[in-house]
Curated annotation (Swiss-Prot):
Highest taxon in the source lineage: Bacteria
Region annotation Disordered: where it falls in the sequence: 133-160
Locations listed in the record: Cytoplasm
Gene symbol of the encoding locus: smpB
Protein family per UniProt: Belongs to the SmpB family.
Protein name in the entry: SsrA-binding protein
GO molecular function: RNA binding
GO BP annotation list: trans-translation
């Protein structure tokens, strides 16, 4: 019988988040991938530095790459520091890569990183989503819906 996992293994520490992704895209399918990082990149991420606001993932030659993500140079690094905007390889099973390739081949679909985090075991992970871009009227509808829900909560709170 397997031992239950300690609570510390279930925690995840979010380092970078793409907050605009949920507003700009319809998110369909979610994936979790490991990232191949250098030592100074890991240290920089542990300090909470890093941005995935304008990044995306692409499938090339049976591999998935995180493109245009920014992990600044480690402040205490020496001449062996990393390049901040280099493409980073994502670690996935072949079955997951096939799902991504098939999803991206559909018209208008893209792979968007939602967050970079360290899991309970201290491994850097990326949460990806297969997404389709929203049009302007879709964004307006989302905003109206969010405002209406907020107004409903306010009315219920004031009544009760």
């Amino acid at each position: 019988m397997a031992r239950p996992r300690p609570a510390e293994f279930e925690k995840k520490k979010v380092v970078a988040e793409n907050r605009r992704a949920r507003f700009d895209y319809f998110l369909e399918q979610f994936f979790e991938a490991g990232i191949a990082l250098t030592g100074t990149e890991v240290k920089s991420l542990r300090f909470g530095e890093g941005s995935i606001a304008e990044s995306y993932a692409e499938v090339k030659d049976d591999q998935v790459w995180l493109v245009n993500s920014n992990v600044p140079e480690f402040s205490h690094g020496n001449r062996f520091n990393h390049e901040p905007k280099r493409p980073r390889k994502l670690l996935l099973h072949a079955r997951e890569i096939d799902k991504m390739r098939n999803g991206v081949s559909r018209e208008g679909m893209t792979l968007i990183p939602l967050s970079i985090y360290f899991n309970g075991r201290g491994r850097a992970k990326v949460e990806l989503a297969l997404a389709k871009g929203k049009k302007l009227h879709d964004k307006r509808d989302t905003e109206k819906e969010r405002d209406w829900k907020r107004e409903q909560q306010r009315l219920l709170r004031d009544r009760g």
